[in-house]
């Protein structure tokens, strides 16, 4: 799979989430410590109300951007995408909420990894406008 990845079926092989909770539709860039994921907000999105993408959807999109980055890493290493969880949101600042038709680009940077816990900083843009930023810890579920 070569970047950018915008095919919905390919994205689904990289993340554990399934419709209607899928909040990423593109992986634009990838390095082992950074990535850029995207989402175009559509009217049928579970987190859209009155044409606005809600805070909870934005946070879920950010978490799934991290999951997509991790899933691509596992794909490159010939392993299935693991299940993960938001461990903690250390801080998040939301300057504005996107609207239907907006395309989100979330830049993630891995700050630290220890065992199955990853500390990530993130910034989400619509065009050149920063709409959200913060830090999040994610935790991988143990393999069954």
What annotation goes with each model-predicted range?
Residues 19-54:
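Catalytic strand-loop segment that frames the active site of acyl-thioester-processing enzymes
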Residues 25-28, 90, 95, 109-111:
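Conserved positions in beta-strands of structured domains
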Residues 24-25, 89, 119, 133:
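Hydrophobic residues on conserved beta-strands that form the core of alpha/beta folds
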Residues 3-5, 68-105:
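Hydrophobic beta-strand-centered segment that forms part of the acyl-chain substrate-binding groove
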């Amino acid at each position: 799979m070569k970047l950018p990845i915008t095919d919905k079926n390919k994205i689904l092989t990289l993340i554990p989430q399934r419709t209607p909770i899928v909040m990423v539709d593109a992986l634009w860039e990838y390095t082992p410590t950074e990535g850029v994921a995207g989402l175009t907000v559509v009217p049928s999105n579970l987190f859209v109300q009155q044409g606005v993408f809600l805070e909870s959807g934005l946070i879920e999109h950010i978490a799934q951007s991290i999951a997509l980055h991790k899933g691509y890493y596992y794909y490159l290493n010939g392993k299935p995408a693991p299940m993960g969880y938001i461990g903690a949101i250390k801080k998040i600042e939301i300057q504005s909420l996107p609207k239907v038709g907006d395309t989100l680009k979330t830049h993630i940077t891995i700050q630290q990894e220890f065992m199955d816990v990853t500390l990530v900083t993130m910034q989400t843009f619509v065009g050149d406008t920063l709409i959200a930023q913060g830090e999040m810890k994610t935790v991988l579920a143990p393999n069954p």
